[in-house]
Amino acid sequence: MADKSYQPTLAGLRAFAAVAEKQHFGSAASALGVNQSTLSQALAGLESGLGVRLIERSTRRVFLTPEGRQLLPHARAVLEAVDAFTAAAAGASDPLQGSLRLGLIPTMAPYVLPTVLAGLAERLPALTLRVVEDQTERLLAALREGALDAALIALPAETSGLSAVPIYDEDFVLALPPGHPLSGKRRVP
């Protein structure tokens, strides 16, 4: 009979999932980077704590019991959740790792991308950059919906509800030939 307060260990769940996938103790142990004895102990502890046999062993074969087949998707879901939690924690401590979805307006892309991409893989090997080129309004909508992490846009733009950080200010001038009607004006209407 299982102890109702039993909490499976991650080692036990990983051992169970690996043996189920590999259907071989040696291969499962190798995949987890442990020896066979450690793997067997972790699996035995899980089975004992749950009060059910998960794996049947024969001289030639390893296979799941009906209970093992029923519980395997739950074990995998727990392991995926723990792995996602760990990855999120790593990403939270280092915002320059993981995935960055960057939006750019088409007029900026040819100027910004070569500078941004040059040496990026060497400087930030844990960062995966995905670039989306679109118009300002659609980029802002994608930011608000969570489809982008950041966007380089031109102002003025409606950025309420977002953080907007100016990165540079560039003056543009209109060059005209001598005698043009707009020549000598301080502002272009």
Swiss-Prot record:
One of its GO terms (molecular function) is DNA-binding transcription factor activity. Keywords: Activator, DNA-binding, Transcription, Transcription regulation. GO terms for cellular component: protein-DNA complex. Residues 8-65 form the HTH lysR-type domain. It holds the Pfam family LysR_substrate. Residues 25-44 bind DNA. The keyword Phosphoprotein does not apply. The keyword Nucleotidyltransferase does not apply. Required for the induction the katG gene for catalase. Involved in the response to hydrogen peroxide. Belongs to the LysR transcriptional regulatory family. This is Probable hydrogen peroxide-inducible genes activator. It comes from Mycobacterium xenopi.
